[in-house]
Design a protein with these regions (language model features):
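Short N-terminal targeting/anchoring amphipathic segment
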Residues: 247-263
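Short acidic, S/G/P-rich loop/turn micro-motifs used as interaction or catalytic elements
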Residues: 158-163, 193-195, 234-237, 263-266, ...
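Short, Asp-centered acidic motifs that coordinate Mg2+ and/or phosphate
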Residues: 255-256, 293, 377
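Active-site-proximal region of nucleotide-activated glycan assembly enzymes
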Residues: 107-119, 273-330, 343-344
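Conserved nucleotide-sugar phosphate-binding/catalytic loop shared by glycosyltransferases and other
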Residues: 201-238
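Conserved catalytic-core segment of nucleotide-activated headgroup transferases in glycan assembly
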Residues: 163-176, 312-383
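N-terminal subdomain of nucleotide-sugar transferases
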Residues: 1-54, 59, 66, 82-83, ...
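Generic beta-sheet signal
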Residues: 188, 260, 279-282, 297, ...
């Protein structure tokens, strides 16, 4: 029996005994399988899927392992269904799983199918409703007459450094609202992206970034403009902290809220007080947000329409726009000579955070068909 077979035997035995999962064994098993051919990976995933016990937390772990081996949306859909039907998982655990599934879909574009997106929408709706049962305050909608027309709240679920796309997107939106629209801006970091609160066994857990020192900040600056800043505690989602922010929103009565990303549970609840619009972080899809509105690129309207309608919404939820971004200020200068690229070469640069998934065999075949001796390819990002 080789090491791979031994690992698989141990894994099956532990699952059959409902034992505590030994992540070192699972990691080693995954590393021994991940580079196999697709047929063999699918065979392993199918066999491991058959080991499900009916224990919801173990079953979620098995499904999260299977989808990493065989990137098939059926595992995502089954996970969503099991979480929705579970009475033993509380809303924090469901939110943890919802966020992990969202990360899987983002990192693996082939999982971004209509049914999976609709499943995410239904799951966050259930999570919001369960969360509301624990609130000790009443969410009161601010009327148009009483709102402060000179104040806009911008919310983001992560705020770290300018190298971080969502952080820069949030600052860019704050800048435009203040500089171009002449509104005061209050920036809130909800700190509930990919949280560990509510953690259940899940293979290859992704964790949101957080800078604890920022909790002392009351103001941030971007391009010469200053914005009031508040950062939620690191232990989000927390009912006490959620209520504190919601009470502040009801007191401040902003004219609107701009939600960067839009999948935060706090953003979903804030929408019940003030009209909220989500701005997605990618051009290529729709955000499973509970805000009243979201901006979608004009080119994606035909794609998102059936998804939006299957989720029970109308296209009034969608505001057509143009996906925009700006490059961060350049702080480092690299020449062709520095990295060994000839001056007369034609260079194709591929930039991305998930190049390992996006550069497929089909893409490489296409690339090979157009390459010649005077061309070079440069990969910039995660690969």
């Amino acid at each position: 029996m080789n090491r791979e077979e031994e690992l698989y035997r141990i894994f099956k035995e532990e699952l059959s005994k409902d034992s505590k999962i030994r992540y070192s064994i699972v990691d080693e098993l995954f590393n021994s399988i991940k580079d196999k051919n697709q047929d063999l990976k699918r065979k392993y995933a199918s066999e491991i899927h058959g080991l499900m016990t009916g224990n919801i937390t173990l079953d979620i772990f098995i499904l999260s392992f299977c989808v990493r081996i065989d990137i098939d949306v059926k595992y995502i859909k089954e996970m969503q269904e099991k979480v929705m039907l579970s009475d033993s998982l509380d809303w924090r655990q469901k939110y943890f799983i919802y966020q992990q599934i969202g990360s899987l879909i983002f990192l693996n574009p082939q999982l971004n199918e209509k049914d999976a997106v609709v499943g995410q929408w239904k799951l966050i709706e259930q999570i919001r409703d369960l969360c509301k049962t624990e609130l000790t305050i009443e969410l009161r909608q601010v009327s148009d007459e009483e709102c402060n027309k000179n104040l806009v709240i911008v919310m983001t679920d992560q705020f770290i450094t300018i190298q971080h796309g969502p952080t820069k997107t949030a600052l860019d939106r704050c800048y435009v609202i203040k500089k171009k629209m002449h509104k005061n801006v209050f920036l809130i970091n909800t700190a509930d992206a990919l949280p560990l609160v509510g953690e259940v066994p899940f293979f290859m857990i992704q964790v949101g970034n957080h800078i604890p020192e920022y909790i002392e900040k009351t103001e941030v600056e971007w391009k010469g403009e200053k914005f009031t800043y508040y950062q939620c505690d690191e232990g989000m989602p927390d009912i006490g902290e959620i209520e504190q922010v919601l009470l502040a929103i009801m007191k401040l009565k902003p004219s609107m809220i701009v939600a960067v990303g839009g999948t935060s549970i706090l953003m979903a609840l804030a929408n019940e007080i003030v009209p909220t619009i989500s701005i997605g972080l990618t051009q290529s899809g729709v955000v499973t947000t509970l805000t009243d509105y979201q901006v979608v690129d004009y080119n994606m309207l035909d794609y998102v329409k059936p998804i939006v309608e299957q989720s029970g919404r109308t296209m009034e939820h969608i505001i057509p726009g143009k996906f925009t971004f700006s490059l961060k200020p350049q702080t480092e200068f690299i020449t062709r000579k520095d990295i060994g690229i000839p001056e007369n070469a034609f260079v194709m640069a591929m930039v991305g955070a998930r190049l390992d998934q996006e550069i497929t065999d089909e893409f490489l075949t296409m690339l090979e068909s157009v390459m010649n001796d005077r061309m070079m390819v440069v990969l910039i990002g995660v690969c």
